[in-house]
DNA sequence: ACAAATAGCGTTTTT
DNA sequence: CGCTATTTGT
């Protein structure tokens, strides 16, 4: 083993080797993009184990995502296949490690919990809070923002909790919620760390005392995670942390300020640097250097490579069409689609690319954050299992019975009665849930479980999404059975563990079918691109107002710059930036100043925004296609609410009016059509062509009188009434009369 | 019951 | 800044 390890060490560059061999009790490694950070981290772990004879069980390796933790574990196992998995129990995300400590070593009873406590998602905590408000008749203002208000209330110190800003009972609620969670044996992600931190301060030394704390992507730590680290270090652990201050893009969700500085001072940590980037061509690196905050060195070792292409486009649609053609060409040249990626600033920007790529036959995959909670049927099923496995969880029982979409659709009051009384015979579904643990032995696979709950009946067979729903549920059950088998646990307790483990929230329950075909173009936000790399990267919409997004303060501005830095450093060989002359969203037309910050000699401008006569026709077809699609599956997609924004903005954009008069628009360059019709932009309703504005449509309403139609589509109608102003109506329900 | 006043977003997302 | 949801005032 030691010999094998010598070879590993030889493969490292001097900087990497120094980090691995460093002997100081605390060391932070300032690792540049693409400098082999993960390799150093893994080699360090192996070094500690094989050479320094530190047991894996004496190491705590902390990451922020399950994905990162899985990668580290699987790379260790690949090098050492006979390594028993339970030696790596201390390897995982901050939250899963806190969970492990709480379950195995820390006296959670001191906080009123049992060892079998449950992990709940934020939404369930919110439900609990609303329940408490009702039960205790608390006065809470701005209930719609309760989640945010509670978050800030929980962060306030005990001493300052006298009167709330709005003079309501928010602090009382926070206190009650804490009690209630302990009573119901439930912890949120926040509680996992908070409680672990509290107990680590008090508990006896021997219970948890790793010899090493090793942290990946340490720049993303928030205060809670910093405290967790500190608790372990003050128990005698040495520290080895790796991260990149130039890749801080999550400070808005609380990553602590200037971590490297803090760690260096707090623990007299030695700071080492990994300056050499192996990933990108030197042109790309040179451009990236313009966006570094501090003058940290960033050295490349590769050839200059091709210039960065900057494209001027009329709008996102034209860009999408260009990209489709460009990618086809690259594919013909032998670059696989999997090596290409399109980045944008906002989730809502993906839609137009999806539509065009679908039409053009480009295989693609959109990276969307989806958890079980985002799919209504799975959310319902999890609650079904939760109550079945723990009938004390009455909130889940009530939720399942009173759901409108699934189950028996019992009213909330009645459901509460049944669940609280706990008497059988009132509801078949309720009886089945209560009987699950008893009958568990006979239910050997997902199909039998499905049948046991009579889900054929309860998953709302008349709904359009029934097939999709039952497939999703079967898949979830399948994953659960696989988990139980893998853990070699007794069935009921294995299921309980699955349903309550944070691993559930991190697992790819929904992505099974996507990963089959790998050769796809990836579409994602720049945020989501962190940690990935592609041969060809296309960053789209590099306009001011998008990249950078209009931000209030300096800090936000700097974060935007780091974000762009992250985006361009994902590219290995080829990078293209595009900006729009007619951005439909909040962006300004023209190139972002970020493009101007790159030395011109690195750039190649492509300013031809040719008229492409058929483009308008194509665009019309794409929009038509989308309309028929969204009409068909309105209720199935959980992401629907997110996707409504681009839809709306599309209705308002000028193309809508072009679509209504195709003959007129076709021979015009789209850019001209806007500039040549100044009256149009002065109109109150730009979606109407001048002709339509002249022959105004009038409607009569029983209450508001006669009004002028200002906006109209298939479902909605907006009219302006004299003395009343504008009013929106749903056509199907309003009693409107055309005049 | 309606109108005026006020608060606080806006985007990015993991556990 | 401009919009929306909510609270507060009449």
Please place each PLM-identified region on the residue numbering:
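Conserved helicase core region in the C-terminal RecA-like lobe
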Residues: 92-100, 214-217, 242, 346, ...
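Accessory C-terminal helicase-associated subdomains
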Residues: 421-528, 549, 604-607
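ATPase/helicase motor core of nucleic-acid motors
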Residues: 266, 306-307, 335-450, 460, ...
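C-terminal accessory regions
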Residues: 543-634, 692-725
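Accessory N-terminal region flanking or inserted into the helicase ATPase core
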Residues: 1-35, 39-40, 58-60, 109-110, ...
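Helicase P-loop NTPase motor core
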Residues: 33-41, 45, 105, 269-270, ...
């Amino acid at each position: 083993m030691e010999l094998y390890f010598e070879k590993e060490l030889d493969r490292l560059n001097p900087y990497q080797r120094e980090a691995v061999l460093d002997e100081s009790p605390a060391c932070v490694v300032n690792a540049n993009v693409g400098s082999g950070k993960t390799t150093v981290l893994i080699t360090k772990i192996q070094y500690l184990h094989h050479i320094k004879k530190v047991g894996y069980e004496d190491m705590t390796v902390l990451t922020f995502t399950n994905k990162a933790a899985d990668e580290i574990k699987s790379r260790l196992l690949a090098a050492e296949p006979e390594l028993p998995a339970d030696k790596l129990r201390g390897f995982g995300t901050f939250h899963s490690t806190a969970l492990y400590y709480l379950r195995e070593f820390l006296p959670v009873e001191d906080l009123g919990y049992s060892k079998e406590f449950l992990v709940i998602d934020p939404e369930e905590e919110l439900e609990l809070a609303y329940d408490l408000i009702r039960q205790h008749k608390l006065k809470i203002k701005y209930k719609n923002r309760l989640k945010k208000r509670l978050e800030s209330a929980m962060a306030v110190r005990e001493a300052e909790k006298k009167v709330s800003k709005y003079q309501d009972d928010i602090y009382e609620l926070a206190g009650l919620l804490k009690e209630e969670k302990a009573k119901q044996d439930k912890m949120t992600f926040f509680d996992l760390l908070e409680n672990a931190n509290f107990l680590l301060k008090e508990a006896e030394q021997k219970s948890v005392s790793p010899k090493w704390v090793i942290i990946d992507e340490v720049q993303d730590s928030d205060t809670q995670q910093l405290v967790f680290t500190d608790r372990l270090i003050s128990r005698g652990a040495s520290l080895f942390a790796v991260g990149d201050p130039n890749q801080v893009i999550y400070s808005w969700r609380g990553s602590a300020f200037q971590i490297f500085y803090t760690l260096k001072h707090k623990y007299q940590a030695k700071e080492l640097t990994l300056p050499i980037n192996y990933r990108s061509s030197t042109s790309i690196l040179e451009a990236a250097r313009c966006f570094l905050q501090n003058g940290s060195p960033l050295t490349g070792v590769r050839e200059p490579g091709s210039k960065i292409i900057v494209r001027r486009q009329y709008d996102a649609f034209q860009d999408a069409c260009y990209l489709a053609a460009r990618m086809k060409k690259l594919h013909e040249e032998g670059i696989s689609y999997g090596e290409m990626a399109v980045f944008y600033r906002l989730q809502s920007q993906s839609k137009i690319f999806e539509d065009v790529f679908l039409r053009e036959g480009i295989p693609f995959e959109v990276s969307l954050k989806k958890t079980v909670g985002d799919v209504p049927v799975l959310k319902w099923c999890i609650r079904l299992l939760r109550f079945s496995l723990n009938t004390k969880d009455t909130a889940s029982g009530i939720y399942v019975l009173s759901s409108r979409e699934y189950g028996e659709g019992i009213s909330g009051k009645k459901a509460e009665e049944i669940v609280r009384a706990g008497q059988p015979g009132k509801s078949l579904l309720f009886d089945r849930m209560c009987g699950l643990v008893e009958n568990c032995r006979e239910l050997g696979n997902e199909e039998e479980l499905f049948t046991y709950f009579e889900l054929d009946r309860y998953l709302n067979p008349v709904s359009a999404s029934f097939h999709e729903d039952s497939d999703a549920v079967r898949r979830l059950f399948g994953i659960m059975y696989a988990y139980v088998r893998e853990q070699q646990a007794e069935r009921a307790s294995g299921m309980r563990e699955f349903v309550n483990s944070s691993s559930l929230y991190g697992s790819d329950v929904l992505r099974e079918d996507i990963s089959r075909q790998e050769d796809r173009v990836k579409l994602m936000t720049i945020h989501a691109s962190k940690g990935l790399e592609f041969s060809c990267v296309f960053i789209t919409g590099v306009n001011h107002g998008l990249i950078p997004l209009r931000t209030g303060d300096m800090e936000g501005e700097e974060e935007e710059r780091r974000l762009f830095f992250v985006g361009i450093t994902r590219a290995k060989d080829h990078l293209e930036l595009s900006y729009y002359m007619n951005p439909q969203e909040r962006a300004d037309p023209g190139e972002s100043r970020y493009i101007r910050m790159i030395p011109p000699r690195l750039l190649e401008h492509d300013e031809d925004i040719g008229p492409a006569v058929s483009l308008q026709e194509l665009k019309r077809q794409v929009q038509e296609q989308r309309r028929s699609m969204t009409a068909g599956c309105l209720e199935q997609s959980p992401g629907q609410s997110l996707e409504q924004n681009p839809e709306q903005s599309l209705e308002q954009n000028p193309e809508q009016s072009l679509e209504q008069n195709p003959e007129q628009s076709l021979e015009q360059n789209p850019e001209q059509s806007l500039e040549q019709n100044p009256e149009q932009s002065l109109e109150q309703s730009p979606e109407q062509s001048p002709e339509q504005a002249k022959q105004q449509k009038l409607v009569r309403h029983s209450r508001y009188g006669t009004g002028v139609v200002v906006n109209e589509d298939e479902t909605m109608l907006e009219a302006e009434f004299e003395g009343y102003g504008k009013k929106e109506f749903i056509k199907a329900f309003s009693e409107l009369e055309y005049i």
